[in-house]
Amino acid sequence: MGREFLDIFENWAQSYDSSVYGHDEQYRDVFDGYETILNTVVEKSGNVVLEFGVGTGNLTKKLIEANKTVYGIEPSAPMRELAKEKLGHVTIEDGDFLQFPLPNEPFDTIVSTYAFHHLTDQEKEEAIGKYSTLLRKGGKIVFADTAFINREAYEAMIAEAKQKGFVDLAEDLQREYYTTIPALEHMFTTHGFTVTFTPMNRFVWLMEAVKQ
């Protein structure tokens, strides 16, 4: 359920914002257009939003500024503390993509950025199936995350990272569960969603799935 990576991200908590805003050369392409990616997720979201992987609260802040009601889920205690320091009074609960407390009101959108790859493909499909039962017709899943058009593209990106000496990025790509667009499309359509995929940079795709 992605919690096996908690130690890594708790160590990254203090420097995460520095990385996403381009100060870590290895991850510069991963976070290229970061503000645009977050803003696009906000634009495509409804009024009551369940957010997975709040992290330091960058997306959450934008959702709140857009007058959305946000219920955040974040498994890392240090990340939750950083987000609360940044945002003030906001609901951020301990949980993950598969095990989480439900909000006390219906929500129309589930969002996440840079986090769904913490799940294996089997767990991703389990999560999407669960969200299908929770969303009403017309409800949305709006995710932005690293994925690849096929396995060859994935392998090529690992080779490129190694060639550039980007050891951390290469290890990241091999350690976590980065999947392909065809695999994600199958998961969403199997569970009653229509889905579109839009490339946002060399790594990240925007996924907008609508419950039918």
UniProtKB/Swiss-Prot annotation:
S-adenosyl-L-methionine binds at residues 53, 74, 96. Keywords: Methyltransferase, S-adenosyl-L-methionine, Transferase. GO terms for biological process: methylation. The keyword Metal-binding does not apply. It comes from the Bacteria. GO terms for molecular function: S-adenosylmethionine-dependent methyltransferase activity. The keyword S-adenosyl-L-methionine applies. Its EC number is 2.1.1.-. Signal peptide: none annotated. It is an enzyme of class 2 (transferase). Coiled coil: none annotated. PANTHER family: TRANS-ACONITATE 2-METHYLTRANSFERASE-RELATED. Could be a S-adenosyl-L-methionine-dependent methyltransferase. Belongs to the methyltransferase superfamily. YrrT family. This is Uncharacterized methyltransferase Aflv_0758. It comes from Anoxybacillus flavithermus (strain DSM 21510 / WK1). The lineage of its organism: Bacteria, Bacillati, Bacillota, Bacilli, Bacillales.
